Amino acid sequence: MSEKLKFRLPTAEDAAEYISYRQAFLDAGSSMDGTGPMRRTPDPMEWLAINAQYADPATVPEGKVQSTQFVCERVSDGRIVGMLQVRLALNDYLLHYGGHIGYSVRPDERRKGYASWMLAQGLDYCRSMGLRKVLITCLNTNEAS
């Protein structure tokens, strides 16, 4: 992969990119894995607030787990090409269906190596947070993963 990427936390400055990223998935009828409640949250500021709630162990909703949301930005044009969410624990649902890491690449940016690069960054973050074993799940129909 020749593109330079940034793996970082989302900010309010990403609002236009958030809207574009979300719409690309809706238009493609594609799953928004690793984006938290993006599908049901059209407002980027609301999405950021929800991510902040889940990032703080004191405010995570009952039955949910602490998580950290990341975006993958292509440096050359500032475009968000992917998103990845790290869950710092597993509940019953995540143990069977979601795992510690969920991620997605914008439909028109797939097959460029972005997912592999993001996953490596996500695993580094997991190690930095003390996770020694990480569960990643995938549907059988997801040939790229």
Where are these regions (language model features)?
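GNAT-family acyltransferases
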Residues: 2-100
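Short aromatic/hydrophobic contact patches that present stacked aromatics
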Residues: 6, 102, 135-137
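Charged catalytic carboxylate motif
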Residues: 17, 118, 144
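Short coil/turn motifs at secondary-structure junctions
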Residues: 89-91, 108, 141
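Conserved acetyl-CoA-binding loop-helix of GNAT-fold acetyltransferases
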Residues: 102-105, 111-128
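Conserved beta-strand-loop-alpha-helix junction that forms the acyl-donor binding cleft
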Residues: 110, 136-145
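Conserved GNAT acetyl-CoA-binding A-motif
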Residues: 126-137
